[in-house]
Structure formats: C-alpha cells, structure tokens
Design a protein with these regions (language model features):
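Transmembrane helix boundary and interhelical junction motifs in multipass membrane proteins
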Residues: 154-159, 237-242, 253-255, 272, ...
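A juxtamembrane structural motif centered on a specific transmembrane helix
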Residues: 1-2, 29, 311-351
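N-terminal membrane topogenic signal
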Residues: 2-19
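Hydrophobic alpha-helical transmembrane segments of multi-pass inner membrane proteins, especially
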Residues: 15-221, 260-320, 345
Length: 351
C-alpha cells in the first residue's frame, strides 16, 4: 500500500476488485466479439498478463522512486506523442497508434499516467508559498502534452488531464476559492476551443444535444447504445442474447461502448454490480490516500484514483447519452492493451 512492498500488507480488496472487474469485462468482450473475431479475447488476456508482470515489478519498488522519475516519464511521453504524430497509424480519422507487429500502442494512454506522475513530482518538490508561480508552471507542464494529444485528435484523453490537474492542485493545498476562479476562467475560455475541434468532433457535440439530427451518421452509435441499455430492463436479455449486440447494431461495442453490451444483456442489475465494483475500487484508492502520512503518497493515490474514476464516469455517461462521445475506454473492461496496461501500472502504484 504505497510503500516498498511486503506481501503480508498486500491489499487484497484492491486487487480482488480489479480482478473481478477484468473477469466481468472478459465476459462482455466475449459476447461482443465471439461471432466476429475471437483474437480480441486472446489479445486482451495477453495484455493482462503483460500488465500483471508490470504490476508485480512495481509493487516491489518504493513509489517514491517512481515519482522521482516523473520528469523522465514526462519527456518520454512527449517523445512518444511526437513519434505518433509523424509515424502513427490512422483510424477513424485519428492518428493515435503505433503499430508493433501483433500489437498496437496508444501513446496518449501512457501520457495521461506519465503526465500525472510528473505533476506529482513537481508539486511534491515545491511548497505552497509561491502558489501562483507553481500553479502556472504546473499548468504548462500539462499544456504541452495536452496540445499534442488534442492534435491527434484525441479529445477524450486530452480532457482527462484537466480533472487530474485540478484534483492534484486541491490535494496539494490550493484553496477552493482559487480553484473555482481558475475553473471559471477555463470555462469562460472554452468556447474558443470550438475552433480547434475537427469536424467529426463538432458533429459529436451537436448530436449530444440531439442525436436525432443525424440518426444514421454521427448520432447512430449513441442512439443504438441507448436502445440497447434501455431494452435490457432490470435483469437483461441474458449473456450472448443481446439483439442490438449480436445483430451488429452496436458499433465500437468491444471498446468505448462495451457498457452498452452489459446494459442490454445483464440489465440494470448487472450494470449496478459493475458500478459497485468500480465504486469499491476507487473508494479503496482514496482510503489508501487518507491513511498515508506522506504528501507524495497522498498525491499519488489521489492521482491514480482520479484517472480511473473519471474514465468510468465519462465512459458510462457517454454510452447513455449524458455526455458527448469522446472516445474514452472503460478501465479493465474495454478492449485495448494500452488502456489495460496503464490501469495495471496505476494499480501497482496504489498497491
């Protein structure tokens, strides 16, 4: 638990909950893809095993040593983001991936973790006396990779950095009044961001307000997702029996919209169980922060908890039409090696 690890102190609640979420996720993934391509299951398990190796390695390293390399990770993330900008493969209008033979790597996924570590290192090394100077510096630490990620374009991952940034500032000691002032300034400037968005991102924001304006185009996935979740009722249609899923009405059902599969086949009850597991996981992470006396450890635990928790909130809200589609995976559930590996590393830091 945020220290040089001793197995008698192993947090079985944290690890057991994460394992349960992953197993449930495999069931959803199998249902989403078994009639299409079973390779997705094999790859997901392979990534999990790789992630398990990283997890085991990290729990045997004092978390302070990992945080002390935050700036190294930061520059590594910038290098990876620049490489993908020039040499990355393009899918669905976005250039986010590096092809590595059988696997693909998404640098922006690693960047959100590495940037968090660099912010933690900076805030740990600087006191709160020079608040304005340190906030501005921390902001620019976040801003450079934010722009590179947004240029891919990957709006979801870029926006993920914002709540992490504010949570870390609050834990570090910035008063709420000052935080609200900064957030207000960001919100006031946010309309300018419209001009930085790609056309398909603008379409997503428009269909968020009214998916029916383009029911066969930009609004199609959200409409089908809401139909799937709504038709699941209380207990669902049964595993492998979701009509929206099995008849291929749901697009991206193995990645960003896998919760739609859960809602249709396992219903409200199944979705509630999954949400309860996530609640236990994130709450446990914040409990670790509460029990830690070291300011660096508190920042680390809260940072990892925020990365996981915000993704869950945004992804599930997105599938139900409560938020615009921004392309964030559901941690430990959505198909994707980079996301899974980053989550396993975050859990290793927490453990």
């Amino acid at each position: 638990m945020l220290k040089a690890h001793k197995y008698k102190d192993f947090d079985w609640v944290l690890v057991g909950t994460a394992a349960a979420i992953f197993i449930v996720g495999l069931l959803f993934l199998f249902s989403a893809m078994y009639s299409k391509n079973i390779d997705f299951i094999i790859r997901q398990i392979a990534w999990f095993l790789i992630g398990a190796l990283f997890f085991i390695a990290i729990i045997n390293i004092n978390y302070r040593k990992i945080i002390s390399l935050g700036y190294v990770f930061y520059f590594l993330s910038l290098i990876l983001l620049l490489i993908v900008f020039f040499f990355g493969s393009k899918r669905l209008g976005a250039q986010r991936w590096l092809e590595l033979g059988y696997f693909n790597l998404q640098p922006s996924e690693f960047a959100k973790l590495f940037i968090t570590l660099s912010l933690i290192q900076y805030l740990t090394e600087h006191k709160t006396e020079k608040v304005v100077k340190n906030i501005v510096t921390a902001f620019f630490i976040m801003l450079v990779p934010f722009v590179l990620i947004l240029a891919q374009p990957d709006l979801g991952t870029a926006l993920m950095l914002v709540p992490v940034f504010f949570v870390l500032l609050y834990i570090w000691g910035v008063r709420l009044k000052r935080l609200f002032f900064i957030i207000g300034g960001c919100l006031a400037a946010s309309p300018l961001g419209w001009f930085l968005l790609k056309d398909y991102q603008k379409e997503r924001l428009m269909v968020f307000m009214n998916p029916d304006i383009d029911p066969l185009g930009a609004g199609y996935t959200v409409i089908q997702s809401r139909i799937a979740i709504g038709s699941g009722g209380v207990f669902g249609k049964g595993w492998l029996s979701g009509t929206q899923n099995q008849l291929n009405f749901l697009t991206e059902r193995h990645t960003d919209f896998i919760f739609s599969v859960a809602g249709e086949e396992w219903g409200f009850a199944g979705g509630a169980v999954l949400l309860a597991l996530y609640y236990i996981l994130v709450r446990r992470a914040f409990e670790i922060a509460r029990k830690t006396d070291d300011p660096c450890g508190v920042l680390a635990a809260c940072g990892m908890a925020t990365i996981i928790g915000i993704q869950v909130i945004v992804n599930i809200s997105m599938t139900m039409g409560f938020m615009p589609v921004v392309g964030l995976p559901l941690p430990l559930v959505s198909y994707g090696g980079s996301s899974l590996l980053v989550t396993m590393i975050a859990l290793g830091i927490l453990e």
